[in-house]
Amino acid sequence: MPHTIALILAGGTGSRFGSARPKQFTLVAGRTVLEHSIAAFEQSEEIDEIGIVVHPKHLDEVRDLLRQQPHPKVTQVVAGGKERQDSTLNGLRAFLREDGTLKNPVERERKSTTSPPNSAVCAPAGLSSGKSPQATEKSPLFSAENSELSAETPQLFADNPQSATANGEHSTDNSLLSVDSPPLSTDNPPAVRILIHDAVRPGVSRSLIGRVCAALRSHAVANVVLPVVDTLIEVDADGQMRRVPDRALLRRVQTPQGFHAPVLFEAYRRALADPDFRATDDCSVVFRYCPEIDIALVPGEERNLKLTYPEDLTVLAHYLTQPLP
């Protein structure tokens, strides 16, 4: 079975939300938005590990959150980058080598001298045996006896030296540009699958996660979509109406998006060679830079809406008080 990693991107600042705090830390239905998203992947039998990518200024807040409510599958908390694509790459590099294969626990070790006391440390359970981390009564991630680092034990939740500078600002690593590209192949099951999810979609369900993983059995990439119900118009640079697209041919995009790890790495390797590259989602990177890859379209869910405006909280509170499908 492939090893499946969920990357939860929680690095946004929420400028449209109109709050001093990033919206992923907003309370709704008794928990933060981020906690709701983590819980859905934690409860999915398809997911082996979870990584959280967060703005460098909020690393400690996420660590504290996870100490209060441990999630055994969360094995990495990583500093995000300046742009969305930088955050994705930082998250991928926390788990994977540049060829898309899984790092072993020693390779994951972080020796950051800036980490706060009691940073969580543990070897991700089951990496050597291929099994997923298992929940225990007392999670090893936050126990006092694990506060000392050793050569055999990777430091998790450490500041990522590749993604945050000494003053807390972002930096960008383009090392993928120097990696030789192997031929893309989707014939065999991948050793590693990656699901990438926006933290501010807390209504994601276990059934949706399962459908994305099912699509990855026959496709290298899976995108989550919904039909467009409103009429849309296209405008020009001056804001003047120019065209009315056929909405029957349009879809709204959601997350989680799923990938065979080597395919996603190759898409980003090609993208980083483009000086005009900028991504708003990861499937679009594959679509643009790896056009030879067929992308599966998975039906999304209305409950999986993206928290964007304060008014969305009322709708999300309704969904989040209902049992997850």
Kindly label every feature range from the protein language model:
Residues M1, R97-R193:
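Intrinsic disorder/low-complexity segments
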Residues P2-V62, T75:
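N-terminal glycine-rich phosphate-binding loop and ensuing alpha1 helix
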Residues I8, L34, G91, H197-D198, ...:
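Residue-level signal for inorganic ion chemistry
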Residues A40-E42, L66, F95:
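Hydrophobic C-terminal alpha-helix "anchor/cap" residues
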Residues H71-K82:
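Conserved donor nucleotide-binding strand/loop of the catalytic core
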Residues K82, R251-P325:
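Conserved alpha/beta core of the MobA/IspD/sugar-nucleotide pyrophosphorylase nucleotidyltransferase superfamily
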Residues R84-E109, D187-V235, Q254:
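Conserved beta-loop-beta/alpha segment of the NTase-like Rossmann-fold superfamily
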Residues E234-F259:
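Short, flexible, basic/aromatic active-site loop/helix in glycosyltransferases
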